[in-house]
Swiss-Prot record:
It comes from Rickettsia akari (strain Hartford). CDD domains: Ribosomal_L22. The keyword Amino-acid biosynthesis does not apply. GO terms for molecular function: rRNA binding; structural constituent of ribosome. Belongs to the universal ribosomal protein uL22 family. Gene3D superfamilies: Ribosomal protein L22/L17 (3.90.470.10). This is Large ribosomal subunit protein uL22. NCBIfam families: rplV_bact. This protein binds specifically to 23S rRNA; its binding is stimulated by other ribosomal proteins, e.g. L4, L17, and L20. It is important during the early stages of 50S assembly. It makes multiple contacts with different domains of the 23S rRNA in the assembled 50S subunit and ribosome. One of its GO terms (biological process) is translation. InterPro entries: Ribosomal_uL22, Ribosomal_uL22_bac/chlpt-type, Ribosomal_uL22_bac/org-type, Ribosomal_uL22_CS, Ribosomal_uL22_sf. The keyword Lipoprotein does not apply. Keywords: Ribonucleoprotein, Ribosomal protein, RNA-binding, rRNA-binding.
């Protein structure tokens, strides 16, 4: 079997304690962005989850550099997908002996960086 020359690297952050809707706001923002620009944007973002996304992105860059020998200056984020993980169900007491259910959502984040050719 002949192995192809890979020019992409991936990283994932599983069971992140944030709802997929909120995480997707940050993931959609950095999609198709250069890695260097995305790291700057995530550093100064006001979103709480941006710190986790930045760590996952740095992991993908390290995978590209160390495992595949890719040039980190030419890396672009080609995929940043968000998926649902588990949901913790909690109970909140309410008035008159009632109770309501609270759902605490978790998410999975997958980031793929690809080395783009200079044109």
């Amino acid at each position: 079997m002949v192995q192809e020359n890979k020019n992409f690297a991936t990283a994932k952050a599983k069971s992140v304690r944030v709802s997929p809707r909120k995480l997707n706001l940050v993931a959609a923002f950095i999609r198709n962005m250069k890695v260097s620009e995305a790291l700057v944007q995530l550093t100064f973002s006001s979103k709480r989850i941006a710190k986790v996304v930045k760590g996952c992105l740095q992991s993908a860059v390290a995978n590209a550099e160390n495992n595949l020998g890719l040039d980190i200056d030419r890396l672009v984020i080609t995929k940043a997908t968000v998926g649902k993980a588990l949901v913790m169900k909690r109970v909140m007491p309410r008035a008159k002996g009632r109770a309501t259910r609270i759902n605490k959502f978790f998410s999975n984040l997958y980031i793929t960086v690809t080395e783009k050719e200079d044109n």
